């Protein structure tokens, strides 16, 4: 667990692969080149050793991408509680702006054709190339846990290094929700993500704070306020 998030197991040595894993390449590649391996042989057959990669436990479930925003200037709303040397201090407001899931070619339809072994014998390999984004709302009972994870992520970012100002603005928790209704966070993107594109007119989540609030407008809003000297203070 890191920053309050439960994460899939990461393997450092491909020889340790003894069950389904997903191999991902570094950078925002839209899923291109990712592949599933069940053992070292699978890994060697598909890996591009010239690229930096991560081997991660493959978790079955629904993938949801949670778009949050952290505003260090706001003193109202859901306040992130500091930890460590920031314990007892409010660091700023956390907002859930929107949520999406990704359409991926061709893994979303692969299961209809048979087992992975059979398909590979036929020369077919699943791919995870992102082709689109769909708006999502999740079960309300999952929202408290979503905020706990996001709050822990922001609080932990203030402790990454001395004098750190933490993670400011938009970020995305890339998650899997299992059939036991548990979150696994497989990646954190400290930026605006493409999944926010369906919400240029706002979302059911952002409308709680202000109607028609997109991630882009939220960035513009806090940037505008930060230019007013009387409102800017990073002292903790």
Model-based region annotation:
Residues 1-101, 136-156:
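Active-site nucleotide/adenylate-binding loops and adjacent lid/helix of ATP-dependent enzymes
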Residues 22-24, 67-68, 181-192:
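A short beta-strand motif that forms the metal-chelation/ATP-contact edge
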Residues 28-30, 172, 193:
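Gly/Ser/Thr-rich loops at beta-strand to alpha-helix junctions
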Residues 31, 64, 181, 194, ...:
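Active-site-proximal flexible loops/turns
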Residues 67, 161-180:
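A short glycine-rich, hydrophobically flanked beta-strand micro-motif that places a catalytic Asp/Glu
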Residues 68-158, 189-220:
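ATP-dependent carboxylate/phosphate-activation module, predominantly the ATP-grasp catalytic core
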Residues 95, 173-174, 181-186:
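Conserved active-site beta-strand-loop modules that form the wall/rim of enzyme catalytic pockets
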Residues 217-236:
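Cysteine/selenocysteine-centered motifs that mediate thiol-based redox chemistry or coordinate metal-sulfur cofactors
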